[in-house]
C-alpha cells in the first residue's frame, strides 16, 4: 500500500473513512498486517503483558520499545509506525527528549504518551522538535495503580466534561492524534466531533475516527483465557491469520466492528 502519513490519517477523518490500527511487535506481523491493509502499526508497551508475561505495562523499558520498533520497521511496507513511550520515560524534559530520540531513530513515525491536559507541555516540547505525538486518554494502563484497576473512565458528568476539555487543550497544544480507551461510546463520539485531529478508539464505540486492538486479543490469544468486552476474536471461523487481519480491516472500514456489544455506556 502507499505510505501512510499523518496527512493521510487527517484526510481519512475528513472523508469519514475509518482508520485501522493494530498493535505489532515484530517484522513478520508487520508485513502481514500491511498485506491486510492495516494503516497504523502500534508498537505498544502492551508487549510487556503479551510478549514478556508481566501483569502490567510498567516494567517495559525504552530499550525494549526501541528493539521492537526496529523489528517492526524491517517488516513494514507503508504503514505508519506509532510507538509508546513507556512508563516514566517522559517524566522530565531530558527523559522525554532522550526516549523520543531513541524510538524515532529506531523507526517510529509518531509517539504515544498517556495522560490528560497536564501533558500539554511535553506535547509542545516534542512537536517543536519534529516528533508528532498521540495522547492516550481514558483508561491509561501506565497509571492503573492510580485508577484502582482497569475501569471505564468518564462515566460521570464531571469526568466527561474534564475529558472533553482535556482533548481540546491537547489539540491546541499540538497533539497530532488522540486514542480513547474504555470511554463511554457517547462521550467518545462527542470528543471525536469536538477536535479536528484523528481520534482512535478501543472500547470507545464506533463513532471514533478509527479502531485499534491488541493483535493477540483479536487473534484469540490470551495468557489469562479471558478477553476484554471490547475484543472480538477475528480468528474464529478463519483458516489463516491473514484472513483474520483482513476481516478486521473490512469490518472497521464498514463500521460493523465494533458493535454495540463491544462498547460501554455512561
Curated annotation (Swiss-Prot):
<dbReference type="GO" id="GO:0015940">
    <property type="term" value="P:pantothenate biosynthetic process"/>
</dbReference>
<keyword id="KW-0963">Cytoplasm</keyword>
<dbReference type="GO" id="GO:0000287">
    <property type="term" value="F:magnesium ion binding"/>
</dbReference>
<feature type="binding site">
    <location>
        <begin position="45"/>
        <end position="46"/>
    </location>
    <ligand>
        <name>3-methyl-2-oxobutanoate</name>
    </ligand>
</feature>
<dbReference type="InterPro" id="IPR040442">
    <property type="entry name" value="Pyrv_kinase-like_dom_sf"/>
</dbReference>
<dbReference type="GO" id="GO:0005737">
    <property type="term" value="C:cytoplasm"/>
</dbReference>
<feature type="active site" description="Proton acceptor">
    <location>
        <position position="181"/>
    </location>
</feature>
<keyword id="KW-0479">Metal-binding</keyword>
<comment type="similarity">
    <text>Belongs to the PanB family.</text>
</comment>
<keyword id="KW-0460">Magnesium</keyword>
<dbReference type="InterPro" id="IPR003700">
    <property type="entry name" value="Pantoate_hydroxy_MeTrfase"/>
</dbReference>
<dbReference type="GO" id="GO:0003864">
    <property type="term" value="F:3-methyl-2-oxobutanoate hydroxymethyltransferase activity"/>
</dbReference>
<keyword id="KW-0566">Pantothenate biosynthesis</keyword>
<comment type="function">
    <text>Catalyzes the reversible reaction in which hydroxymethyl group from 5,10-methylenetetrahydrofolate is transferred onto alpha-ketoisovalerate to form ketopantoate.</text>
</comment>
<feature type="binding site">
    <location>
        <position position="114"/>
    </location>
    <ligand>
        <name>Mg(2+)</name>
    </ligand>
</feature>
<comment type="subunit">
    <text>Homodecamer; pentamer of dimers.</text>
</comment>
<protein>
    <recommendedName>
        <fullName>3-methyl-2-oxobutanoate hydroxymethyltransferase 2</fullName>
        <ecNumber>2.1.2.11</ecNumber>
    </recommendedName>
</protein>
<comment type="pathway">
    <text>Cofactor biosynthesis; (R)-pantothenate biosynthesis; (R)-pantoate from 3-methyl-2-oxobutanoate: step 1/2.</text>
</comment>
<feature type="binding site">
    <location>
        <position position="84"/>
    </location>
    <ligand>
        <name>3-methyl-2-oxobutanoate</name>
    </ligand>
</feature>
<keyword id="KW-0808">Transferase</keyword>
<feature type="binding site">
    <location>
        <position position="112"/>
    </location>
    <ligand>
        <name>3-methyl-2-oxobutanoate</name>
    </ligand>
</feature>
<dbReference type="Pfam" id="PF02548">
    <property type="entry name" value="Pantoate_transf"/>
</dbReference>
<feature type="binding site">
    <location>
        <position position="45"/>
    </location>
    <ligand>
        <name>Mg(2+)</name>
    </ligand>
</feature>
<dbReference type="InterPro" id="IPR015813">
    <property type="entry name" value="Pyrv/PenolPyrv_kinase-like_dom"/>
</dbReference>
<feature type="binding site">
    <location>
        <position position="84"/>
    </location>
    <ligand>
        <name>Mg(2+)</name>
    </ligand>
</feature>
Amino acid at each position: 500500500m502507499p505510505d501512510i502519513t499523518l496527512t493521510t490519517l487527517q484526510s481519512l477523518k475528513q472523508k469519514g473513512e475509518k482508520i485501522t490500527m493494530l498493535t505489532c511487535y515484530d517484522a513478520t506481523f508487520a508485513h502481514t498486517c500491511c498485506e491486510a491493509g492495516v494503516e497504523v502499526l502500534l508498537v505498544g508497551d502492551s508487549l510487556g503483558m503479551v510478549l514478556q508475561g508481566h501483569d502490567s505495562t510498567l516494567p517495559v523499558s525504552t530499550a525494549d520499545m526501541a528493539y521492537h520498533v526496529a523489528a517492526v520497521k524491517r517488516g513494514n511496507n507503508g504503514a505508519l509506525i506509532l510507538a509508546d513511550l513507556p512508563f516514566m520515560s517522559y517524566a522530565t524534559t531530558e527523559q522525554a527528549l532522550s526516549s523520543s530520540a531513541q524510538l524515532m531513530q529506531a523507526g517510529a513515525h509518531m509517539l504515544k504518551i498517556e495522560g490528560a491536559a497536564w501533558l500539554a507541555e511535553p506535547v509542545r516540547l516534542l512537536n517543536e522538535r519534529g516528533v508528532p505525538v498521540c495522547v492516550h486518554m481514558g483508561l491509561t494502563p501506565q497509571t492503573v495503580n492510580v485508577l484502582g484497576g482497569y475501569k471505564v473512565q468518564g462515566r460521570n458528568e464531571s469526568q466527561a466534561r474534564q475529558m472533553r476539555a482535556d482533548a481540546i487543550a491537547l489539540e491546541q497544544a499540538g497533539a497530532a492524534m488522540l486514542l480513547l480507551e474504555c470511554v463511554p461510546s457517547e462521550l467518545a463520539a462527542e470528543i471525536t466531533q469536538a477536535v479536528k485531529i484523528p481520534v482512535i478508539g478501543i472500547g470507545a464505540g464506533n463513532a471514533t475516527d478509527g479502531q485499534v486492538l491488541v493483535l493477540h486479543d483479536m487473534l484469540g490469544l490470551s495468557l489469562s483465557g479471558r478477553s476484554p468486552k471490547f475484543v472480538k476474536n477475528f480468528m474464529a471461523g478463519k483458516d489463516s491469520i491473514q484472513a483474520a487481519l483482513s476481516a478486521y480491516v473490512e469490518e472497521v472500514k464498514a463500521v460493523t466492528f465494533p458493535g454495540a456489544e463491544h462498547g460501554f455506556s455512561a
